[in-house]
Amino acid sequence: MKKFILALLATAAMAMAESHTHDGFFLNLALGFGYQGFTYDANKAIYDMEAKGVSTEFDLKLGGCIATNTLLHATILGVTNNSEIDYKTKGGKKLGSSSEESENLSMLGIGLTYYLPENIFISGSVGFAQFNLQDNSDEDKDIEGATEKGLGVQIAAGKEWWVSDNWGLGLSVAFTYGAAEDKDDLGDASAYGVNVMFSATFN
């Protein structure tokens, strides 16, 4: 993955970008909010977990043009579920809930973004996903536990508006999915989410 990213950046650095065109170097920063549904099915763990509610997402895409209006990029994203975590028995009986912990999904992968006329775009990324639980009870917000790396996917579609020769501001809808096994076969985590994203793109 590191060699791929370095090669990608080297290719992008050599490409000269013209104004109001999708060529050369590509940088996309996006922040948004929406909904995520998270489930943890226990195997050796004592209880199941579930969190469904408001989420926030941050994305970074970095790469370059490989064909007309087509960008190849590395994708880094993080989704935080801001709702309470419910703890349940394996039979589904609720044991309690807590707001002192929050679930996070992170992904590192590769993707393609394609621009249609009128600056409408579609984007897809696939990579390694990982879940962790964050302790919100103190200022340090320590990570309490993390799963193994699993599968992550993001699909997005939206529109951008040029605000300078090479910068554009955008609005999109992003769907994310992640699934991973916990360490030592304690359980299986999965999550899906839909977020409205606001972005700034240099291209």
Model-based region annotation:
Residues 1-23:
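Cleavable N-terminal export/targeting peptides
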Residues 49-50, 72-111, 132-134:
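Surface-exposed loop and membrane-interface regions of Gram-negative outer-membrane beta-barrel proteins
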Residues 27-31, 74, 110-112, 122-126, ...:
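Membrane-embedded beta-strand positions of outer-membrane beta-barrel proteins
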Residues 56, 78, 106, 128-132, ...:
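Transmembrane beta-barrel architecture of outer-membrane proteins
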Residues 68-74, 119-122, 161-169:
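Repeated loop/turn-to-beta-strand initiation elements of outer-membrane beta-barrel proteins
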Residues 36-42, 79-88, 94, 135, ...:
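Predominantly the C-terminal beta-signal and adjacent terminal strand-loop region
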Residues 17-86, 191-203:
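Short glycine/proline- and aromatic-enriched beta-strand/turn motifs that initiate or cap beta-hairpins
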